[in-house]
Amino acid sequence: MDASAIKLTPKDIVSQLNEYIVGQNDAKKKVAIALRNRYRRSQLDEEMKQEIVPKNILMIGPTGVGKTEIARRMAKIVGAPFIKVEATKFTEVGYVGRDVESMVRDLVDVAVRLVKEDRKDKVKDEAVKKANDKLVKLLVPSMKKKANQNAGNPFESIFGGMMPNFGNNDEEDEEPPTEDIKTKRSEIRSQLLNGQLEEEKVRIKVEQDPGALGMLGTNQNQQVQDMMNQLMPKKKVEREVPVKTARKILADEYADELIDHETANQEALELAEQMGIIFIDEIDKVASNNQGGGQDVSRQGVQRDILPIVEGSVVQTKYGSVNTEHMLFIGAGAFHVSKPSDLIPELQGRFPIRVELDSLSVDDFVNILKEPKLSLIKQYEALLQTEEVTVNFTDEAITRLAEIAYQVNQDTDNIGARRLHTILEKMLEDLSYEAPGMPNAVVDITAQYVDDKLKSISTNKDLSAFIL
């Protein structure tokens, strides 16, 4: 995790969020304060630190207005482990389905990946050097030792190589390189480092992914799979790949060997406990709607299972136990049918910060198309530029696109900013199809162009074909 990122002030965090997300300033402000409070807590003495727990956030707003994106970007800014789960995927204890503790295990998996990627990045140069050394030996191999060919496994001559050769080391089976081979390797090394051999084919041994077990329930499946992976020896298969691909594979393997996995796992557990963010989407779907019946009872059961995780409990993972007390939980939902007050009182109390996100207006759609650092307009311009087609959007065209997207949302299901993907894809459909045959073309997207391509939905109220 970036140590400097956690020291960002709330204004700095909001400023960075503004580069990717339009509007919703109240939501940005609240998540920025929650993030800053984590830094403040880290500066306190141990006794006070243990008493301060995160103030969880409940985001209320329709789909497509930025709830998930705000939380995801916030986590990315500080390198915190983040997962998004859907409350409707969980079932009460004793029923078939995912148990609520799986969200914590998934978060720890993300934390482990983040920590190991960070550590691998620190030993990247050494790993690449080792990979290049190995590639040189593969491109200019030494003679094999014939006398010891089957010395590693006496059963190999009987079973024809079907037995795993434990402890076999290819380099130990090679004769010391002759002067001629040393000279060739020196020449190959120079060519390799100069990038002249990137497309050359080379045969390497790579670890084979173990097959998944499909006959068990989700959580049971994962636990048994993890246990089997630890018990079974790692099987390697030979593949022929280009040098540039082989370097990546070998460098990753060497980096994996260079890092201390035990301390990395412990660091990941600490990171998940202190900086983890769990985004629980569709939490309104497990709220009781006061209609009674078995469905309400089942929903309350899921809420009561989520409650101890949010309150703080110890969950066992394959890396060790992790305490959820200081994790930040962000609940989100549209709350069209139910209200936040329909959640059980204990769970309501665990989400003390409420923020309502606004529905998107035409002006919001215009800003979404123009302002973000990697806006949709810029994405489509970049995609078509790969075909040497230059696309220019006029301000009038962008406004017209925003008006159509807003109108479609009003006339059908409101899916927020996601509607822009549908509209843009439909408008640029013909151009994307013809682009490979239009080198060096320049296409101006005007309001008239937008109307011509989208007249079927801008004038026709039967918009069912455009509902995502």
From Swiss-Prot:
Keyword Coiled coil among UniProt keywords: no
Gene Ontology CC: HslUV protease complex
Signal peptide (from-to): none
Binding of ATP, residues: 22, 64-69, 281, 346, 418
Record localization: Cytoplasm
NCBIfam families: hslU, PRK05201.1
A Pfam short name: AAA_2
InterPro entries in the record: AAA+_ATPase, ATP-dep_Clp_protease_ClpX, ATPase_AAA_core, Clp_ATPase_C, HslU, P-loop_NTPase
Assembly mode: A double ring-shaped homohexamer of HslV is capped on each side by a ring-shaped HslU homohexamer. The assembly of the HslU/HslV complex is dependent on binding of ATP.
Alphabetized UniProt keyword annotations: ATP-binding, Chaperone, Cytoplasm, Nucleotide-binding
Gene that encodes the chain: hslU
Keyword Chaperone (UniProt): yes
Gene Ontology biological process terms from the UniProt entry: protein unfolding; proteolysis involved in protein catabolic process
Role this protein plays: ATPase subunit of a proteasome-like degradation complex; this subunit has chaperone activity. The binding of ATP and its subsequent hydrolysis by HslU are essential for unfolding of protein substrates subsequently hydrolyzed by HslV. HslU recognizes the N-terminal part of its protein substrates and unfolds these before they are guided to HslV for hydrolysis.
HAMAP family, alphabetized: HslU
Family that this chain belongs to: Belongs to the ClpX chaperone family. HslU subfamily.
Region Disordered: start-end pairs: 166-187
Residue spans of biased composition, Acidic residues class: 169-178
Entry protein name: ATP-dependent protease ATPase subunit HslU
GO molecular function (one): peptidase activity
